Structure formats: C-alpha cells, structure tokens
Design a protein with these regions (language model features):
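H-loop/switch region of ABC-family ATPase nucleotide-binding domains
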Residues: 175-177
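Catalytic Walker B motif of ABC-type/P-loop ATPase nucleotide-binding domains
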Residues: 140-144
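Conserved ABC ATPase signature
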Residues: 115-119, 123
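ABC ATPase NBD coupling module
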Residues: 60-74
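Helix-to-loop junction immediately C-terminal to a conserved catalytic motif
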Residues: 44-45
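Q-loop/switch helix immediately C-terminal to the Walker
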Residues: 72, 79-100
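Hydrophobic anchor residue at the start of the ABC signature
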Residues: 128-129
C-alpha cells in the first residue's frame, strides 16, 4: 500500500500545503464554497500548474508522463464530461464492469446502450464513478461524489467507494459539504478555510 504524499504544494497563488494520506486511508476535506478545494484536487491530479512535490509510492508527479499520473491518481469531478451519446462508448471495456457494481448503483448491462442525453444528473454521476473505477486507480480524489444523489444512492456510492479503497489499500481524498458523510467515510478530516488555509478537524 502506497501513501499519497504532498510536500509544499502551491497552485494559483495558494499554499504551501503539506499532508500525507496513507494507503487504505480516506481523508475528508470540508470547507466553504470558493475556498479552493476543487483547485487542490486539480493540482493533485496534475490538471493545473503547481509547485512542490506530489508522490504516490515510487511515482513522483513531475517525473512521470501526465497521462500515466492521471490514470494512476483518479479524480472524480463534481460534473464529469461525456463525449458520446451512448453510455458504453465511454468505457474502455464495458463488459469488465462487475455485475454487482452495476446493480449496487441501480443499473444492469442494458445501460450500455442508454443515451447520455436522456440521463439524469444522478445517473451520470453514478456512471462516472463506475467509469473511474474501471481504470483501477491507485489513489482517488473525489469532488463531492454524491452531491446530485438521493439518500439511497448516496449510501450505495459510499459503500462501493469505501469497499474499493479497503480492498485495494489505496489513499482517498473525499471532498464534501456534508459533515455527517465525512464522519461515515473518513477516518481523518481537514478543513479548508475561506482564505485557503488547511486546518485539522471540521470546518
């Protein structure tokens, strides 16, 4: 199990930030809108320019090709992008999705042929989670993964993501505005203040 180590991270005039997320650990991150939580995730995923050092075990962000880092450190944005109008075309191999994972999130194999344009925001989010997990990331960065879901699906998503983290022994950073959710899924929490400082504990 590898830890995600962040040392003196800076981006968009913010930071420096230093913290470690252990292998198999979920770190929760709370804070007001506009504080910079999404910017932090984007820097960790190497989607935005940044300074400092980010490493996952032997992999160092600035020393490997960006596509490799982004496959290894998977980020789920608050709103995922969809390029085609058929669900199955967004998956490397739709047939490799475990049937129990599809069922847990309220789908079966017929969803492969559904049209993206007819999906609700909640259906898109649940499918985005399945798409991300199919890549078998070795760390997860989650930007409010259940914000568009009802209570039942929130529970199913929490169960699926927590199960993946534990089975794979990966570090996970989970951003949420719901303190009760972070109490359920995260063993440790940080809070980002309105001026961008990171503090231990609740926001």
């Amino acid at each position: 199990m590898h830890s995600l180590e962040v040392v003196e991270l800076t981006f968009h005039g913010r930071g420096p930030y230093s913290f470690t997320i252990g292998g198999g650990e979920c770190l929760g991150l709370a804070g007001p809108s506009g504080a910079g939580k999404t910017l932090l995730l984007r820097a960790l995923a190497d989607l935005d320019p940044h300074g400092g050092r980010i490493s996952l075990g032997p992999l160092v962000c600035d020393q490997v090709p960006a596509p490799l880092w982004r496959r290894t450190v998977g980020m789920l944005p608050a709103e995922s992008l969809w390029w085609y109008d058929r669900v199955g075309d967004h998956f490397v191999d739709f047939d490799r999705i475990p049937e129990q994972d599809l069922a847990m999130l309220g789908f079966d194999s017929s969803v492969r042929d559904w049209q993206i344009s007819r999906l609700s925001s909640g259906e898109k989010q649940r499918l985005a989670i399945l798409r991300l997990l199919q890549n078998r990331p070795r760390a997860l960065l989650l930007d409010e993964p259940t914000a568009s879901l009802d209570a039942d699906n929130i529970g199913h998503v929490e169960e699926l993501l927590t199960g993946y983290r534990r089975e794979q022994g990966i570090p996970m950073l989970w951003v949420s505005h719901d303190p009760d959710q972070l109490e359920r899924v995260a063993g440790r929490r940080l809070a980002m203040t309105a001026d961008g400082r990171l503090l231990a504990g609740e926001a």
